[in-house]
Each structure stands twice: as structure tokens, then as C-alpha cells.
Amino acid sequence: MMNIILIGARGAGKSKVSRSLSKQSEIPVVSTDSVAVYETGGIPIPKFVENNGWKAFRELEYSILQKLQNANGIILDCGGGILFDLDESGNEVLSERKLDLLRKIGRIVYLERGIEELVEKVKGDKTRPDLSKITTYRSILEKRLPVYQEAAHFKLNLTKLSKEEAAEKILDWIGIKSKSI
């Protein structure tokens, strides 16, 4: 069975859509962020990043994807930065190695929302670590959104869709019958 990989910005709705997809398809969800917390012995991601930095977190994501490359029949709910690594200067760059693994693992679905909508959704959310002390989330999004688009096999704008409708569209695209009808 094919794996479904959900990518998109922080706040796009990947976790909600993945749960709805799972409910409709009976395919289990694996969250890269949940696995990361598990792998660090329960340390929340903001704390891990604070203690170890983003570069270490991006390495952790890569090791998680390596472990999942032979997975079969999962919905992979990816953290917003899954497609990125940091260069020597600490700038975000496309992670070819992670993208290659994601493409090996399954079909990539980009869950898209507008920048304004995303900025509003994550404002003041303390469960999410700061992406940068200097750069605004808006400018990070401006760089990331085209990368998500390029990486995806399928793009779905969630602005006017419920999580259930989004899940149905993804299942239709993949050719899996919804079990909840």
C-alpha cells in the first residue's frame, strides 16, 4: 500500500487532515514531530531546539525519515520544516536528502493556505518553537511556500475546505475509497 505524506507550513492543518484521512481510510498516522519527541526521550521540540539548535533538529528529522523509508501503508504528518536543512551560515535551504527520502517513502501532498491565514493561525502559539529570533514567520513562509509547491505530487488549498473534505480529495486523488461513507 502506498504511503501518503502531508507537507505544508506550520499551521496549515497537516495534523487535523492526517487524523481525518486516517479515520476515513483506516490508515495509521505517523507524525514526524511526535516521533522526534519520542526519540529525544520526551523532550518537547521547543526545548530540544532551545538546547540543541535547529541544525540538530533537522538532523533528527533526517534520521526519522531514514527509519521510515521502508514503511508501508502510513500517513506521514510532517513538521513544517521537513523539507529544509541549514547551510553553514544557518540559513534554511532545500534539503535534497530529505526530499529524496520523502519521495521514496510515498506520494507528497502539499496542504496549502495563504500567508495571512498561516501567520494568524500560529500567532502566540507557545507549543511551537520560534523559527528564528530575527526573521519573521511571514518572510520564512515567503521562502518556504514555493519549495513546498515544487516538492509536492499533489497540491490542495485548504482555505475553503473542511478537514473531512480535504481528506476525501486526497483519497480520491490516490484512488482509495473512503471507509466512512
Curated annotation (Swiss-Prot):
Pathway it works in: Metabolic intermediate biosynthesis; chorismate biosynthesis; chorismate from D-erythrose 4-phosphate and phosphoenolpyruvate: step 5/7
Sorted UniProt keywords: Amino-acid biosynthesis, Aromatic amino acid biosynthesis, ATP-binding, Cytoplasm, Kinase, Magnesium, Metal-binding, Nucleotide-binding, Transferase
Role this protein plays: Catalyzes the specific phosphorylation of the 3-hydroxyl group of shikimic acid using ATP as a cosubstrate.
Lineage per the UniProt record: Bacteria, Pseudomonadati, Spirochaetota, Spirochaetia, Leptospirales
Cofactor note: Binds 1 Mg(2+) ion per subunit.
Binding residues annotated for Mg(2+), in chain numbering: S15
Predominant subcellular localization, coarse grouping: cytoplasm
Quaternary organization: Monomer.
Record-level GO BP terms: amino acid biosynthetic process; aromatic amino acid family biosynthetic process; chorismate biosynthetic process
EC code(s) of this entry: 2.7.1.71
Taxonomy, superkingdom: Bacteria
Gene that specifies this protein: aroK
Localisation: Cytoplasm
Catalytic activity annotation: shikimate + ATP = 3-phosphoshikimate + ADP + H(+)
Record's GO cellular component terms: cytosol
Name of protein: Shikimate kinase
A molecular-function term among this protein's GO annotations: shikimate kinase activity
